[in-house]
């Protein structure tokens, strides 16, 4: 009998516990009560009405684009009957970040999130015919698109990416005649911006960024970042693929410089790997050689520095490719604890490539990164020494390759060099240092760009030097 009573008591206790568990939520609101018991029904900040989302328990207050959110006043707060909160009407709150509002009603409570969101009206991306990337100047509110001369600019279809919650006119995906500038207006609440879009058809580009894919938007992030810079900063520049050059679908008759910035996860180590990993460049080598021999210049960075050996720059010796190469994967890029650098070669501090740089402690150093930047350290350099590599000293390297040393690593390796223009052939500038890097997949907290600006300064110097 005693056992039976104990069993009944135990069963009753378990039943009560299960009922309690079923009747309560993580927010201490009984499932037997109305959900409105701890509800924010209305809230305004500085008389700007908040939008209450009951599902996510979020109140979002939309504000003008440049509104000061440091000290906002709760001008209205209406809660469900009998409820109170840790924020009261008339209170001043700092809305630079989201605020938590704790609403209680008797033994019940719910936590809500209060967010101030400035209205934003920006165009982030403007791509024509899914191929040609627009250069956006956010300050001037202009978008510039360069297309090959054969493209019909009277019926181009732009794909436009703009601020969340905004509307854009004309609509994205609708064909437009860009014979004359077209104004795109983005509106989001109190914010509005007008972007003037100019499309220029270029029959004969002045500069070309070359890559292995049909469009620049298909480039890897490192190369795409570099290409985007060129399109925004070098007049009459275009992206072209190696296939375009091989098939001669791009007119290079007025092209002053071809830039190839070649990234490959894990690196490209020497002659044979270059042939294997860049077959598209090998396929176009005859056209590239003709361009070079007719006076065309090259700017070759990272693993693209292998190319001169295949287009006759070093004579018939194909085995003059960089002999000391490595690199990491973009997704696992190394964190820079501080500035990385290489050195200007003795006697070359006055070279045009090194002018106007952001200077550091060492006047002979070329600093290119800052703390908090992630870098793949993709390197294609020449080891110098009698131990291995075929170049006993710098003079031996210059004698065999015909190159001129511009920059060296800490161990004396050749990391930047040029093949000067001669006999009607174009000049070539090469940078194989792992410090020359355009893309960081993320930036650590507190990152401030200082020395990384030197990457774009060096690049602009290279274009100015090669097109003079």
Positions of predicted regions on the chain:
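Bacterial N-terminal signal peptides that target proteins for export
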Residues: 2-13
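C-terminal motif of bacterial Sec signal peptides marking the signal peptidase cleavage site
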Residues: 19-23
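Beta-rich interaction/scaffold domains
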Residues: 24-206
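Conserved beta-strand elements of the Class I
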Residues: 206-208, 429
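Helical hinge/lid and interdomain linker segments adjacent to catalytic or ligand-binding clefts
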Residues: 208, 216-317
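A glycine-rich, often tryptophan-bearing local segment used as a flexible ligand/cofactor-contacting loop or short
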Residues: 270-375
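Catalytic beta-strand/loop cores that center a nucleophilic Ser/Cys/Thr
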Residues: 334-433
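Extracellular ligand-binding/catalytic regions of CAZymes and related secreted enzymes
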Residues: 404, 411-468
């Amino acid at each position: 009998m005693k056992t039976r009573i104990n069993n009944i008591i135990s069963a009753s206790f378990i039943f009560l516990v299960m009922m309690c568990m079923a009747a309560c939520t993580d927010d201490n609101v009984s499932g037997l009560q109305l959900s409105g018991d701890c509800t924010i029904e209305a809230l305004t900040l500085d008389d700007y009405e908040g939008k209450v989302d009951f599902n996510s328990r979020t109140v979002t207050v939309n504000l003008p684009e440049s509104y000061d959110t440091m000290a906002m006043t709760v001008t209205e707060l209406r809660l469900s009957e009998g409820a109170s909160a840790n924020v009261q009407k008339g209170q001043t709150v700092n809305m630079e970040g989201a605020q938590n509002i704790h609403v209680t009603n008797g033994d019940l409570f719910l936590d809500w999130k209060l967010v101030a969101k400035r209205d934003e009206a920006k165009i982030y991306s403007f791509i024509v015919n899914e191929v040609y990337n627009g250069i956006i100047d956010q300050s001037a509110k202009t978008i510039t698109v360069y297309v090959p001369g054969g493209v019909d600019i009277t019926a181009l279809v732009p794909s436009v990416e703009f601020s969340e919650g905004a509307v854009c006119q004309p609509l994205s995906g609708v064909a437009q005649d860009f014979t004359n500038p077209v104004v795109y207006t983005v509106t989001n609440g109190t914010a509005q911006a007008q972007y003037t879009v100019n499309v220029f058809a270029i029959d004969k580009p002045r500069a070309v960024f070359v890559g292995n894919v049909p469009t620049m938007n298909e480039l890897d992030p490192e190369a795409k970042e570099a290409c985007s810079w060129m399109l925004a900063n070098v007049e009459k520049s275009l992206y072209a693929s190696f296939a375009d050059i091989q098939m001669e679908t791009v007119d290079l008759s007025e092209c002053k410089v071809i830039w190839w910035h070649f990234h490959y996860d894990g690196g490209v180590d020497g002659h044979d790997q270059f042939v294997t990993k860049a077959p598209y460049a090998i396929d176009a080598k005859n056209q590239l050689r003709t361009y070079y021999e007719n006076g065309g210049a090259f700017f070759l960075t990272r693993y693209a520095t292998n190319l001169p050996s295949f287009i006759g720059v070093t004579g018939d010796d194909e085995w003059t490719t960089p002999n000391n190469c490595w690199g990491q994967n973009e997704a696992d890029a190394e964190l820079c604890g501080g500035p990385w650098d290489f050195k200007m070669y003795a006697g070359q501090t006055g070279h045009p490539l090194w002018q106007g740089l952001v200077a550091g402690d060492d006047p002979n150093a070329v600093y290119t990164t800052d703390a908090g930047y992630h870098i793949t350290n993709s390197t294609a350099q020449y080891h110098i020494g009698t131990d291995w590599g075929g170049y006993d000293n710098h003079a031996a390297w210059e004698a065999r390759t015909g190159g001129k040393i511009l920059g060296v690593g800490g161990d004396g390796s050749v990391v930047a060099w040029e093949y000067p223009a001669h006999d009607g052939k174009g000049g070539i500038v090469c940078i194989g240092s792992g410090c020359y890097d355009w893309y960081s997949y993320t930036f650590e907290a507190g990152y401030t760009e200082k020395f990384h600006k030197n990457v774009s300064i060096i690049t602009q110097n290279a274009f100015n030097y090669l097109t003079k």
